[in-house]
Amino acid sequence: MKTKLFGLLMLAVLTLFSCKEKEPEAAMATEVSEAPDSSDYDKKVAVVRAFFQAHCDENIDALSAMLADDMKWSPPQYNGNQWLGKEDLLAALKSYHDNFDNIKYAEGLVMPDSTANGFWSGSVFPGQSADNSAGVLRVYGTWTAIHTESGKEIGVKYYNLSSVNDDGKIVQSSDYFDVNGLAAQIEAQE
């Protein structure tokens, strides 16, 4: 009888504690508590758009004016993850201007049935590092141009991470696109 009573008592205790509602965990504090600053995001997007337009216009002076003097740039090709500076980026852009005509940028993620937004910022996941600021812009699009020497039209899908400071200057930029794909398009036999 004592065994049955002890068993019923243990079952009651287990039921009581297992049915207790969990209290909210401190981890829930990662929820974004303030609304995102859309005007800050819009200003930074405008800077990057203007930078891309200056590249299309082959205006090296305008490009230089939009870059902070101490900006850091990561080129699209692998270089041991070494960050380069403003003059390196301007030299690369000047090389494109010297070798390509009719440089154009089409903003957005090309999907099977549409083109999605080309600028993103902030995050929801992972929760422990969720962020609703426009600190780093994620940029998606497609560049096209005419290779000057061969007359061939080239195109490349493009992804970039850019940061813009309070002065409206680009302070960090990391490019991702298929550099070798450009060469393959130029060298391809028709």
PLM features: residue spans?
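C-terminal and inter-domain tail/linker signature
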Residues: 4-7, 20-190
